[in-house]
């Protein structure tokens, strides 16, 4: 969902380059993210991080890991940045990239990422837009490059069509998963993902008793 532009967003982004990293600089940091964080802790990436609540909650809960939220909309990135700055002390394990997730290998080197999160991605329901879906083959090829061996991807969506398309796409790509790593109603099967952190959309859909589809696949 595209947010209404906020006049303060771009100035805020410009004022906080240590937290919010713009596209060109992020590309220059490819392969060097450990130096950005000052350690070699596992690096987790959310593609399409929106207003940032999910990636922020992860960074708070898991200080032993590093987290990056990749988002195209400046207003969304700025809102996420404001949330991060409200944390005391400041989160040293969180960065935001203002950039396009069309090819994540532009930003990350081979085997640089431990896990990728896709949360409530645009389903792009029209057949002519298939290649824009974040679980299409062209995206999976990029993910397979940047993920560590046996690195994982977690997908959560309320859109059954996108979920079933993703399952088919994963299988065609040669991926498989055990029964305990897939759910057609996650909130009633939390034993499969007991450390689940809800997204903003997920909370809304749960209140409407709408099922949350979830899968974790290893590359």
Curated annotation (Swiss-Prot):
Q: Name one GO cellular component term.
A: tRNA methyltransferase complex
From the UniProt record, give the pathway where this protein acts: tRNA modification; N(7)-methylguanine-tRNA biosynthesis
Keywords of the record, alphabetical order, are: Methyltransferase, S-adenosyl-L-methionine, Transferase, tRNA processing
Provide the GO MF annotations for this entry.
tRNA (guanine(46)-N7)-methyltransferase activity
TM helices/strands, residue ranges: none
Q: Where is the active site?
A: 122
So where does substrate get bound? 126, 158, 199-202
Keyword Methyltransferase listed? The answer is: yes
InterPro entries, per this entry? SAM-dependent_MTases_sf, tRNA_(Gua-N-7)_MeTrfase_Trmb, tRNA_methyltr_TrmB_bact
- What role does it play? Catalyzes the formation of N(7)-methylguanine at position 46 (m7G46) in tRNA.
What's the protein here called?
Answer: tRNA (guanine-N(7)-)-methyltransferase
Q: Which organism is it from?
A: Oenococcus oeni (strain ATCC BAA-331 / PSU-1)
Its ancestry begins with: Bacteria, Bacillati, Bacillota, Bacilli, Lactobacillales
């Amino acid at each position: 969902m595209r947010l209404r532009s906020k006049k303060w967003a771009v100035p805020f982004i410009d004022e906080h380059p240590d937290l919010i990293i713009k596209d060109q600089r992020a590309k220059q940091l490819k392969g060097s993210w450990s130096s950005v964080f000052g350690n070699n802790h596992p690096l987790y990436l959310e593609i399409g991080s929106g207003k940032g609540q999910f990636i922020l909650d992860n960074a708070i809960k898991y200080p032993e890991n590093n987290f990056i939220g990749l988002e195209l909309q400046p207003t969304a990135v700025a809102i996420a940045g404001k949330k991060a700055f409200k944390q005391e002390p400041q989160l040293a394990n969180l960065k935001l990239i203002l950039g396009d997730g069309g090819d994540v290998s532009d930003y990350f080197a081979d085997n640089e990422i431990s896990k990728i999160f896709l949360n409530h991605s645009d389903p792009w329901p029209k057949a002519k837009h298939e290649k824009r879906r974040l679980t299409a083959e062209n995206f999976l090829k990029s993910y397979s490059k940047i993920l560590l061996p046996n690195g994982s991807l977690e997908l959560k969506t309320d859109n059954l069509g996108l979920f079933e398309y993703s399952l088919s796409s994963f299988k065609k790509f040669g991926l498989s998963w055990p029964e305990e790593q897939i759910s057609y109603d996650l909130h009633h099967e939390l034993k499969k993902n007991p450390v689940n952190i809800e997204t903003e959309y997920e909370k809304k859909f749960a209140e409407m008793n709408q099922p949350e589809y979830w899968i974790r696949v290893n590359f």
